A protein has these predicted regions:
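Conserved cytochrome P450 K-helix E-x-x-R motif and the immediately C-terminal K′/meander segment
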Residues: 2-38
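Cytochrome P450 heme-thiolate "Cys pocket" and heme-binding signature region
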Residues: 59, 72-117, 124-132
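Charge-rich, low-complexity terminal tails
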Residues: 128-149
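Conserved cytochrome P450 K-helix/beta-meander segment immediately N-terminal to the heme-binding cysteine loop
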Residues: 49-75
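Short, glycine-/Ser/Thr-/acidic-enriched flexible segments
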Residues: 52-53, 89, 147
Length: 149
């Protein structure tokens, strides 16, 4: 990303797709409907599986692989990429902080890539998706952190 600012947005979006902040979000059914033989009565609570939707093979090629390039030139659709909920920001319920989160992730990535040098020792970066928030086993260890001259 240091030499390709155009990779920053796809990188951040791929992190959000593969590692959503929450695995699911809850909602209340606004009006009774039926979908694939299931009845959803008005007022009932439902869960939207964010991780499952963002790794669905019907929508994503090689869905569990980290491939930021999949977001280069990708047309936005408010319903198929839903790391912080689905729908239109202006007319539906979607996380109002989503743009702030994206902006902060980009700023942090720029800082890590352009402003400091550091070493990353061998460590266990495996994530436990059953934990909230899902963190690497060793967290993330950086050594010899120094401001770039």
């Amino acid at each position: 990303m240091r030499n390709d600012e155009g990779l920053l947005e796809p990188f951040v979006q791929e992190v959000r797709r593969l590692y959503p902040f929450f695995p699911a979000v809850a909602a209340r059914v606004k009006s009774t409907f039926e979908w694939q033989g299931y009845r959803f009565p008005k007022g009932h609570r439902v869960l939207l599986d964010l991780y499952g939707t963002n790794t669905d093979r019907r929508s994503w090629d090689a869905p569990v692989e980290f491939r930021p390039e999949r977001f280069r030139g990708r047309a936005e659709n408010p319903y198929d990429f839903i790391p912080q909920g689905g729908g239109n920001h202006y007319t539906n319920h979607r996380c109002p902080g989503e743009w702030i989160a994206i902006s902060q992730m980009k700023a942090f990535c720029r800082y890590l890539v352009n402003d400091i040098d550091y070493d990353v020792p061998d460590q266990d970066l495996e994530l436990d998706p059953g934990e909230l928030p899902s963190l690497p086993q060793n967290r993330f260890i950086m050594r010899n952190v120094r401001r770039r001259q």
